């Protein structure tokens, strides 16, 4: 709510219909008729008032009625009112940042009287970073006696101007540089350190270098003055991790500033919050390389930054696909896709950086606990890594010694990660690299891949309860069922975590968190997500009376595992698929493909130990079982497969409802096993002989090959030759 007249924009000419509806809505708020007020506000919103008009209406409204509504109105009325007020706030922000208004204020600042000057300083502060381009231009064009006024204005604005001012230090004018360095030294914000260090160590006038050093010391105190590339790298890492020192204020726009060397002016690029911190990290890495193109220490962070950007974009696009981000406009979605294309194109060439930097990036991701980035690094190393990277065991069997260090040590360490996806992808990468030599971690690779093949779903659950013991208990019990658990210990955290990406598959909530429960049951993002309420003897009756038929189940505290299991069954009874299942299938596929690609003749890995796990995965969708059957073909060529495995393959081949690709893959695997075993079982022969009459020519051909490899009798082949006319239309007797 605007209270200071000096901050009020000029009033926008109003649309009579919108004005009438808005005034009626506010009157209804004042009368506490909240449902009727909500309907009126919805009509106002349906007429698409622009931001400036909404701002004028807001400023003319009865403020107390709006305040009371936020305290007393039902959630649906509050939500509708918030939508209107967010449009009005956009109008206020647009007005504060209007360049024509800023130009008038800068003029008042530089040539106005004392009162106008201080009024301009105050109002320019509300414009924040948006005022910097004009203030810098004015510094370039005016005489030194006005510079102090501009510097005073910038210092009063403070932290919001640090990023554009740091970029503006690239200006050629040394007088302007002096002023900007002085301002940054007075503000004392660590985000300016890299740019100041670049001046101090760069090819600048001695007076500029001296001013830069003085500003640096004001910021760091007695700390060590570091080189510019190191400063840029440290700042990039701070943005990558979203450390407190680099967080934007809630009211600030997310802008990436650049200096145009040709025009000697600032340029800006507005970005969404999800992109800002990672793109800033990327920019700062390149700033370091601009100063020293041999400074390869930035490469691991740059790799992590790109992988994290792609992961973040994919999460948002996934939510768009599920219809869970209604607040995104078509332009927002187009921006997401454009960013994905850009990052994908860049990542297609990052392999040129060399595998040593991907190992370092993996180390960085593991240290940060960033599973998504670690998995991406492991996937890249699956293509780049080689046997020479492994920590090979040397010496004879009695006195074996391990190489002190090896490039692939981060992958070996990842086999012990608490995160399944990190373990599974590390095993896949090591399987691709393994040769005949034993190496540290070898004994974990195949068992880990077998675990990955056994994944059948990794749903995401929210556990929200004020009792930490309940949270810890459910974390363990749900984790054993392959749930990914996000926890919240109070109602506010429950709401924040409940709507954080990725969206949850089930919400397990303390019955006392009524506000959160009601929100989960009504919000479009969560109303289709099953809710399980944790009740006590004291509130069970009231809770069931209120929420019976609205939630999936009630579970009494203290929670018994059997009760929770029954509740989960009830919660998911009508849900056919989840994003968690997709994650599990990805794990299955990665493991099967890794086993399919192992050179069985040149590996120390006990690949035969994976045969049973591969056989069990034949019930999975084609994307997985095709790779599993390739793996069985690969392994079966060199190791005998059990009868049960062959029976499983026969079931796939003999079922005409399966895809042709799956049936062919199973026959190929059976053929490889038959060649290895110098024959096959009667059950396999029986299936193969039946398939000689299959309607698919490719299936008939593969079945014939299996029979030939089985050293079978010539009977089936003669039958095949005797039915030479079964391809195409039946031949009619007497036909020409």
Would you name each region that the model predicts?
Residues 4-20, 89-100, 105-108, 220-231, ...:
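TPR-adjacent "capping" and linker segments in tetratricopeptide-repeat scaffold/adaptor proteins
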Residues 55, 60, 65-70, 227-229, ...:
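Short coil/linker segments at helix-helix boundaries
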Residues 104-112, 134-142, 153, 164-172, ...:
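Alpha-solenoid HEAT/Armadillo-like helical repeat scaffolds in large eukaryotic proteins
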Residues 482-490:
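Short hydrophobic/Thr-rich beta-strand motif most characteristic of the beta2 strand and flanking loop
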Residues 528-538:
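A short, hydrophobic beta-strand element within the central beta-sheet of small alpha/beta folds
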């Amino acid at each position: 709510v605007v209270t200071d007249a000096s901050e009020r924009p000029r009033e926008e000419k109003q649309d009579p219909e919108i004005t009438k509806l808005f005034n009626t809505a506010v009157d209804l708020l004042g009368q506490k008729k909240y449902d009727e007020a909500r309907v009126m506000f919805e009509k106002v919103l349906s007429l698409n008032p622009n931001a400036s008009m909404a701002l004028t209406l807001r400023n003319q409204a009865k403020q107390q009625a709006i305040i009371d509504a936020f305290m007393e109105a039902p959630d649906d009325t509050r939500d509708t009112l918030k939508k209107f007020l967010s449009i009005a706030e956009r109008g206020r922000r647009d007005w504060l940042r209007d360049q024509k208004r800023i130009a008038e204020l800068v003029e008042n600042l530089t040539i106005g009287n004392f009162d106008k000057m201080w009024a301009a300083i105050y109002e320019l502060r509300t414009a924040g970073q948006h005022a910097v381009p004009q203030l810098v231009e004015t510094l370039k064009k005016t005489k030194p006696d006005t510079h102090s006024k501009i510097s005073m204005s910038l210092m009063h604005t403070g932290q919001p101007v640090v990023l554009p001012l740091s970029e503006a230090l690239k200006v050629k004018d040394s007088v302007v540089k002096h002023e900007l360095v002085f301002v940054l030294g007075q503000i004392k914000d660590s985000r300016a350190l890299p740019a100041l260090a670049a001046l101090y160590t760069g090819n600048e006038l001695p007076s500029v270098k001296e001013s830069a050093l003085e500003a640096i010391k004001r910021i760091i105190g007695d700390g060590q003055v570091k080189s510019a590339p190191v400063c840029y790298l440290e700042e990039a890492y701070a943005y990558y991790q979203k450390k407190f020192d680099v967080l934007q204020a809630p009211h600030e726009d997310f802008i990436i500033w650049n200096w145009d060397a040709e025009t000697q002016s600032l340029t800006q690029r507005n970005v969404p919050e999800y992109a800002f911190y990672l793109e800033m990290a990327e920019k700062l890495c390149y700033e370091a390389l601009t100063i020293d193109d041999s400074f390869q220490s930035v490469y691991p962070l740059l790799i992590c930054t790109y992988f994290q950007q792609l992961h973040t974009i994919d999460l948002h696009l996934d939510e768009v696909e599920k219809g869970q981000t209604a607040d995104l406009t078509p332009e927002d979605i187009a921006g997401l896709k454009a960013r994905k294309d850009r990052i994908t194109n860049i990542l297609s060439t990052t392999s040129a950086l060399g595998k040593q930097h991907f190992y370092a990036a993996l180390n960085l991701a593991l240290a940060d606990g960033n599973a998504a980035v670690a998995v991406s690094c492991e996937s890249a190393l699956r293509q780049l890594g080689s046997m020479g990277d492994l920590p090979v065991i040397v010496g004879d069997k009695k006195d074996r010694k391990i190489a002190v260090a090896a490039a692939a040590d981060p992958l070996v360490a990842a086999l012990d990660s608490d995160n399944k996806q990190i373990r599974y992808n590390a095993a896949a990468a090591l399987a691709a690299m393994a040769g005949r030599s034993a190496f540290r971690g070898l004994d974990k690779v195949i068992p880990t891949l077998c675990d990955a093949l056994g994944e059948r779903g990794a749903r995401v659950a929210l556990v929200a309860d004020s009792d930490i013991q309940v949270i810890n208990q459910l974390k363990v019990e749900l984790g054993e069922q392959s749930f990914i658990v996000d926890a919240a210990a109070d109602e506010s955290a429950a709401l924040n975590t409940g709507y954080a990406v990725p969206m949850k598959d089930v919400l397990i909530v303390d019955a006392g968190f009524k506000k959160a429960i009601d929100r989960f049951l009504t919000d479009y993002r969560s109303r289709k997500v099953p809710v399980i309420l944790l009740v006590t003897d004291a509130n069970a009756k009231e809770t069931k009376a209120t929420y019976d038929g609205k939630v999936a189940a009630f579970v009494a505290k203290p929670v018994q595992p059997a009760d929770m299991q029954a509740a989960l069954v009830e919660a998911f009874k009508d849900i056919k698929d989840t994003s968690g299942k997709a994650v599990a299938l990805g794990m299955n596929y990665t493991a099967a493909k890794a086993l399919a690609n192992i050179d069985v003749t040149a590996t120390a890995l006990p690949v035969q130990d994976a045969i049973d796990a591969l056989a069990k995965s034949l019930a999975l969708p084609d994307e997985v079982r095709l790779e599993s059957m390739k793996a069985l073909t690969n392994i079966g060529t060199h190791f005998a497969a059990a009868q049960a495995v062959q029976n499983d393959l026969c079931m796939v081949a003999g079922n005409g409802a399966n895809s042709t690709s799956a049936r062919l893959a199973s026959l190929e695997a059976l053929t490889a096993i038959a060649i290895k075993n110098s024959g096959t079982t009667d059950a396999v022969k029986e299936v193969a002989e039946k398939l000689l009459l299959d309607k698919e020519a490719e299936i008939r051909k593969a079945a014939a090959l299996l029979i030939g490899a089985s050293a079978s009798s010539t009977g089936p082949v003669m039958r095949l030759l005797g039915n030479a006319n079964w391809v195409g239309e039946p031949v009619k007797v007497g036909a020409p």
